[in-house]
A protein has these predicted regions:
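Small beta-barrel nucleic-acid-binding modules, primarily SNase/OB-fold domains
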Residues: 2-138
Length: 138
Protein backbone atom coordinates (compact mmCIF):
# COMPACT_ATOMS: atom_id res chain seq x y z
CA UNK A 1 0.00 0.00 0.00
CA UNK A 2 1.39 3.39 -0.94
CA UNK A 3 0.62 6.03 1.66
CA UNK A 4 -0.88 9.39 0.84
CA UNK A 5 1.81 12.02 0.38
CA UNK A 6 0.06 14.40 2.76
CA UNK A 7 -2.53 13.04 5.19
CA UNK A 8 -3.64 9.54 6.07
CA UNK A 9 -6.66 9.25 8.34
CA UNK A 10 -6.43 5.74 9.71
CA UNK A 11 -10.15 5.31 10.29
CA UNK A 12 -10.82 6.17 6.65
CA UNK A 13 -8.48 3.53 5.24
CA UNK A 14 -8.92 0.92 7.97
CA UNK A 15 -5.18 0.65 8.58
CA UNK A 16 -3.83 -1.30 11.52
CA UNK A 17 -1.60 0.72 13.82
CA UNK A 18 1.17 -0.78 15.95
CA UNK A 19 3.27 1.16 18.45
CA UNK A 20 6.91 0.08 18.24
CA UNK A 21 8.24 2.44 20.90
CA UNK A 22 7.68 5.97 22.21
CA UNK A 23 8.48 7.66 18.90
CA UNK A 24 7.87 4.98 16.24
CA UNK A 25 4.68 3.41 14.91
CA UNK A 26 3.77 1.10 12.06
CA UNK A 27 0.77 1.54 9.79
CA UNK A 28 0.42 -1.58 7.67
CA UNK A 29 3.92 -1.97 6.17
CA UNK A 30 5.05 1.64 6.69
CA UNK A 31 7.24 2.46 9.69
CA UNK A 32 6.71 6.04 10.86
CA UNK A 33 8.92 8.11 13.16
CA UNK A 34 7.17 10.96 14.98
CA UNK A 35 8.93 13.99 13.60
CA UNK A 36 10.65 16.37 15.98
CA UNK A 37 10.93 14.17 19.08
CA UNK A 38 13.14 11.55 20.67
CA UNK A 39 11.92 8.99 23.19
CA UNK A 40 14.02 6.70 25.36
CA UNK A 41 14.92 3.32 23.85
CA UNK A 42 13.42 0.08 25.13
CA UNK A 43 15.80 -2.38 23.47
CA UNK A 44 18.95 -0.28 23.77
CA UNK A 45 18.46 1.35 27.17
CA UNK A 46 21.71 2.20 28.90
CA UNK A 47 20.24 2.19 32.41
CA UNK A 48 17.14 0.91 34.20
CA UNK A 49 15.63 4.41 34.41
CA UNK A 50 15.84 4.79 30.63
CA UNK A 51 14.22 1.39 30.10
CA UNK A 52 11.36 2.29 32.46
CA UNK A 53 10.81 5.66 30.77
CA UNK A 54 10.86 3.96 27.36
CA UNK A 55 8.12 1.54 28.45
CA UNK A 56 6.05 4.41 29.88
CA UNK A 57 6.47 6.39 26.64
CA UNK A 58 5.35 3.41 24.55
CA UNK A 59 2.28 2.87 26.74
CA UNK A 60 1.40 6.58 26.66
CA UNK A 61 1.65 6.61 22.86
CA UNK A 62 -0.61 3.55 22.70
CA UNK A 63 -3.14 5.33 24.95
CA UNK A 64 -3.06 8.47 22.83
CA UNK A 65 -3.48 6.64 19.53
CA UNK A 66 -6.38 4.64 20.93
CA UNK A 67 -8.19 7.71 22.22
CA UNK A 68 -9.48 9.27 19.01
CA UNK A 69 -9.18 9.82 15.27
CA UNK A 70 -5.56 9.49 14.11
CA UNK A 71 -4.14 11.53 11.24
CA UNK A 72 -0.64 10.97 9.88
CA UNK A 73 0.62 14.12 8.18
CA UNK A 74 3.55 14.01 5.85
CA UNK A 75 5.27 17.09 4.49
CA UNK A 76 4.08 18.24 1.06
CA UNK A 77 7.72 17.78 0.02
CA UNK A 78 8.49 14.58 1.90
CA UNK A 79 11.84 14.19 3.55
CA UNK A 80 13.67 10.99 2.70
CA UNK A 81 13.24 8.17 5.19
CA UNK A 82 15.57 8.30 8.18
CA UNK A 83 18.57 5.99 8.40
CA UNK A 84 16.32 3.20 9.68
CA UNK A 85 13.94 3.49 6.70
CA UNK A 86 11.17 5.22 8.65
CA UNK A 87 8.92 7.90 7.20
CA UNK A 88 9.09 11.15 9.18
CA UNK A 89 5.63 12.51 9.88
CA UNK A 90 3.45 14.42 12.32
CA UNK A 91 0.82 12.32 14.04
CA UNK A 92 -2.33 13.95 15.37
CA UNK A 93 -5.13 12.54 17.51
CA UNK A 94 -8.37 14.51 17.29
CA UNK A 95 -6.31 17.39 15.89
CA UNK A 96 -3.74 17.44 18.71
CA UNK A 97 -0.05 16.87 17.96
CA UNK A 98 1.01 13.64 19.67
CA UNK A 99 4.67 14.74 19.75
CA UNK A 100 3.76 17.83 21.77
CA UNK A 101 1.67 15.78 24.17
CA UNK A 102 4.56 13.37 24.73
CA UNK A 103 7.04 16.21 25.27
CA UNK A 104 4.76 18.09 27.67
CA UNK A 105 4.15 14.88 29.62
CA UNK A 106 7.87 14.21 30.00
CA UNK A 107 7.77 11.05 27.86
CA UNK A 108 9.95 12.47 25.08
CA UNK A 109 12.08 15.47 24.26
CA UNK A 110 12.79 17.62 21.25
CA UNK A 111 14.96 15.92 18.64
CA UNK A 112 18.20 17.90 18.33
CA UNK A 113 19.54 16.05 15.32
CA UNK A 114 21.57 13.60 17.36
CA UNK A 115 20.88 11.04 20.04
CA UNK A 116 21.28 12.51 23.51
CA UNK A 117 22.14 10.56 26.65
CA UNK A 118 19.00 9.73 28.67
CA UNK A 119 20.47 8.22 31.81
CA UNK A 120 22.17 11.43 32.95
CA UNK A 121 19.07 13.56 32.40
CA UNK A 122 16.35 11.35 33.82
CA UNK A 123 16.02 13.36 37.00
CA UNK A 124 12.51 14.81 36.45
CA UNK A 125 13.76 18.23 37.53
CA UNK A 126 16.12 18.22 34.54
CA UNK A 127 13.31 17.23 32.19
CA UNK A 128 10.77 19.63 33.69
CA UNK A 129 12.24 22.72 32.06
CA UNK A 130 12.32 21.05 28.65
CA UNK A 131 8.68 19.96 28.91
CA UNK A 132 7.14 23.30 29.86
CA UNK A 133 6.48 24.24 26.26
CA UNK A 134 6.16 22.42 23.00
CA UNK A 135 7.55 24.26 20.05
CA UNK A 136 8.02 21.36 17.67
CA UNK A 137 8.55 22.91 14.26
CA UNK A 138 7.60 21.16 11.05
Amino acid sequence: MRASPLITTLAAIGAALIVIDGDTIRSDEERIRLEGIDAAEIGHAKCEAERRLAILAKHRLEQLLGSGDVDIRRNAHPKPPDRYGRTLARVLVDGEDVACILIKGGYARHWTGRREEWCQSLDRRDLAEATLSCAVSY
